[in-house]
């Protein structure tokens, strides 16, 4: 009789099950037999609780090995988990400790400071904590909340405040007051879009001076020189001087964290220059030799940065990920000589935004020099065209699997997809803007481009055919005995001649594409997506669509539906993020000649019931004047038609009556309202947000029999 998996010794079987990280797979494993159930429960180390805090009798007690516990999504979402007004808060805290005694990493929604008083002391071995809050900061003295936290967590090594609203001066005040805790920190994440002005130079100096052992530091800064205390030479040098052990450094301007798309006609240059230059960058890079991941996302001009990036390559040999915003002169090749970021040959991920002087030649140089790139993002570069992008894709066709092209004037949807044809059978993640190029312009474009040989070494060309731009006699000498592959980059054809035999990209299938992200302007349709070049994506599983614009500038839309039925071309599509949160309109009665947001929701959701979705995240459009993002009646009616849904998360509010529509979805297991945007509404007495209303809906949902 053949040996079965269940015949393995318990120790080996336990190690196998412990190695499975996917939650659904672990749950399936636990259903095999009671023995596997016990092993799965005893080896799970991470858990996210989603039940209602009122149902403490349902708190699981079989996960005794949990070390990472996420309490931020407990229902009702955003309501205080522990506060003086909740019944028996101490009992709730002790029951959590009894169920999960070995927690070392905690995520918790902290709307009331009472949560920080009760929870952290229960786990003295707590080392990592992430605080979540989208509501207003409570009226406390500066730094009081963090003083509570640091007093109760002396062994803290990681603090994540990227989704926690507070004041910027709360943090340095508390860190300076607790030097032992601050010196133990190795990870600090302050990359929070809620900080409207970001951290100033004095605050960054105080934070880095108090935390000399940081290895990962992410912070939102104020680089704009028009503001008092802006971050310039002094602030950047302080980071490198005070925290020399950094392996991950993210410095981003406040405006860089916003979701809003820039002006496609912008030339990439701002009126003001940043108040730091190449010499400062060289000093910073020289002081951080252990850097592996660097983000410098500035919103003011940083000019002539090529020499600094060459020093970055020399001083930081471990660098693998780089993101630059508003940096100019990053790649300005002269003849065959690479420069700037193109010399960072160890990079595996590169993101560039608003590089005003980057052209096709610079883009090609990046493709030649950064030959290990698996991820490439370009945003707001108006001088690059389909020819340069297509050449880069061809140069990186063995490694590139993740691409984002956004807000580039010459790269709309069809042009972007045309440029990526050389890697269309390899790419796994893709973002494009749904700017539908003129069909006539696209078809009539002259079929000329850059033609050159790709016999190269260390980024240099071995072809005299490429003229003075990329010729390299040394490589020609080294490779003259090798097979020569000549590529010609044409908008209408791409072919490879190997000893005279063609091997082109005639198919249109994106075989490995699993994730697709789209930006689309308000009022535009999704229907041209397949005609633009994405008609065949057999393995596409997840799509994210972000709609942005002001509905108030539109009268009635001419078409009945946005075009979600177009996605029926993708047979494996099961997860969708439909983000209309940046769509602005009238929540109530609209002026004559215009329509309110309920009709816009119907426009965008019509046809969603035809898709076989199992998971949906939906952000309703908003009325900024009244800070309202509420699910409308047409939206609730259309969502109830999604008969295959198992998970539905609405990032806004909804009336209880409309929520009850969702009970008609037969296999729906998990529904939640999340106001995870700032500022989250404070009025808990409205019918859209009342805790009792949400609890009644969840109780009705849990009473239904589910087939599996």
UniProtKB/Swiss-Prot annotation:
Keywords: Nucleus, Ubl conjugation pathway. GO terms for biological process: SCF-dependent proteasomal ubiquitin-dependent protein catabolic process. One of its GO terms (cellular component) is SCF ubiquitin ligase complex. This is F-box protein MAX2 homolog A. It comes from the Eukaryota. Part of a putative SCF (SKP1/Cullin/F-box) ubiquitin ligase complex. Interacts with DAD2. Interacts with KAI2IA in the presence of (-)-germacrene D. Mainly expressed in fully expanded leaves, lateral roots, axillary and shoot apex, and, to a lower extent, in internodes and nodes. The keyword Transmembrane helix does not apply. Pfam families: F-box_5. Component of SCF(ASK-cullin-F-box) E3 ubiquitin ligase complexes, which may mediate the ubiquitination and subsequent proteasomal degradation of target proteins. Is necessary for responses to strigolactones and may be involved in the ubiquitin-mediated degradation of specific proteins that activate axillary growth. Targets probably SMAX1A to degradation upon the formation of an E3 SCF ubiquitin ligase complex (ASK-cullin-F-box) containing MAX2A and KAI2IA in response to (-)-germacrene D in the stigma. The keyword Membrane does not apply. Residues 2-49 form the F-box domain. Disruption phenotype: Increased shoot branching. Its main location: nucleus. It is found in: Nucleus.
């Amino acid at each position: 009789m053949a040996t079965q998996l269940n015949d393995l010794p318990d120790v080996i079987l336990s190690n196998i099950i412990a190695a499975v990280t996917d939650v659904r797979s672990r749950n399936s494993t636990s259903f095999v037999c009671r023995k596997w159930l016990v092993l799965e429960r005893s080896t799970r180390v991470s858990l996210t609780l989603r039940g209602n805090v009122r149902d403490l009798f349902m708190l699981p007690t079989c996960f005794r090995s949990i070390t990472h516990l996420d309490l931020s999504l407990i229902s009702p979402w955003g309501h205080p988990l522990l506060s003086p007004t909740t019944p028996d808060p101490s009992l709730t805290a002790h029951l959590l400790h009894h169920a999960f005694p070995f927690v070392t990493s905690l995520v918790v929604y902290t709307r009331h400071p009472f949560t920080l008083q009760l929870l952290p002391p229960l786990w003295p071995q707590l080392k990592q904590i992430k605080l979540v809050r989208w509501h207003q900061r409570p009226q406390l003295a500066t730094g009081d909340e963090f003083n509570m936290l640091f007093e109760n967590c002396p062994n803290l090594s990681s603090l994540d405040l990227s989704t926690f609203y507070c004041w910027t001066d709360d943090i340095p005040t508390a860190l300076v007051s607790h030097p032992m805790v601050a010196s133990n920190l190795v990870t600090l994440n302050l990359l929070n879009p809620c900080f409207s002005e970001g951290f100033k130079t004095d605050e960054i100096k105080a934070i880095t001076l108090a935390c000399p052992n940081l290895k990962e530091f992410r912070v939102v800064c104020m680089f704009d020189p028009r503001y008092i205390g802006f971050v310039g030479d002094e602030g950047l040098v302080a980071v490198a001087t005070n925290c020399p052990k950094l392996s991950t450094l993210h410095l981003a301007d406040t405006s860089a964290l916003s979701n809003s798309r820039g002006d496609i006609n912008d030339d990439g240059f701002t009126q003001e220059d940043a108040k730091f230059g190449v010499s400062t960058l060289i000093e910073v890079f020289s002081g951080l030799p252990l850097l592996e991941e660097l983000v410098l996302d500035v919103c003011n001009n940083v000019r002539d940065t090529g020499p600094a990036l060459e020093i970055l390559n020399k001083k930081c040999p471990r660098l693998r990920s780089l993101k630059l915003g508003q940096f100019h002169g990053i790649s300005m090749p002269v003849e065959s000589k690479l420069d700037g970021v193109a010399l960072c040959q160890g990079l595996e991920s590169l993101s560039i935004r608003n590089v005003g002087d980057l052209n096709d030649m610079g883009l090609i140089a990046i493709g030649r020099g950064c030959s290990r790139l698996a991820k490439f993002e370009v945003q707001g570069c108006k001088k690059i065209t389909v020819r340069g992008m297509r050449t880069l894709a061809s140069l990186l066709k063995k490694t590139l699997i993740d691409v984002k092209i956004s807000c580039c004037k010459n790269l709309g949807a069809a042009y972007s997809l045309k440029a990526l044809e050389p890697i269309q059978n390899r790419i796994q993640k893709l973002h494009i803007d749904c700017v539908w190029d003129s069909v006539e312009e696209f078809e009539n474009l002259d079929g000329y481009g850059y033609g050159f040989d790709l016999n190269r070494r260390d980024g240099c060309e071995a072809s005299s055919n490429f003229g003075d731009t990329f010729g390299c006699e040394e490589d020609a000498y080294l490779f003259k005995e090798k097979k020569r592959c000549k590529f010609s980059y044409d908008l209408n054809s791409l072919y490879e001649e190997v000893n005279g035999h063609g091997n082109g990209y005639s198919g249109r299938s994106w075989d490995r594409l699993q994730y697709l992200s789209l930006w689309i302007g308000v009022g535009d349709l999704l229907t041209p997506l397949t005609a633009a070049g994405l008609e065949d994506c057999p393995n596409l599983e997840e799509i994210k669509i972000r709609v942005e614009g002001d509905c108030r500038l539109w009268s009635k839309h001419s078409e009945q539906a946005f075009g979600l039925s177009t996605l029926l071309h993708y047979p494996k599509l099961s997860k969708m993020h439909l983000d209309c949160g940046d769509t602005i309109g009238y929540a109530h009665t609209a002026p004559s000649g215009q329509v309110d947001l309920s009709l816009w929701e119907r426009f965008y959701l019509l046809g969603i019931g035809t898709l076989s979705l199992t998971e949906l995240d939906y952000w309703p459009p908003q009325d900024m004047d009244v800070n309202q993002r509420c699910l409308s009646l047409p939206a609730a009616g259309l969502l109830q038609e999604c008969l295959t849904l198992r998970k539905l998360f609405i990032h806004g509010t909804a009336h209880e009556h409309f929520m009850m529509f969702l009970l008609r979805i037969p296999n729906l297991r998990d529904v939640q309202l999340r106001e995870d945007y700032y500022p989250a509404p404070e009025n808990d007495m409205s019918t859209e947000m009342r805790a009792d209303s949400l609890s009644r809906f969840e109780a009705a949902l849990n009473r239904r029999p589910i087939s599996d």
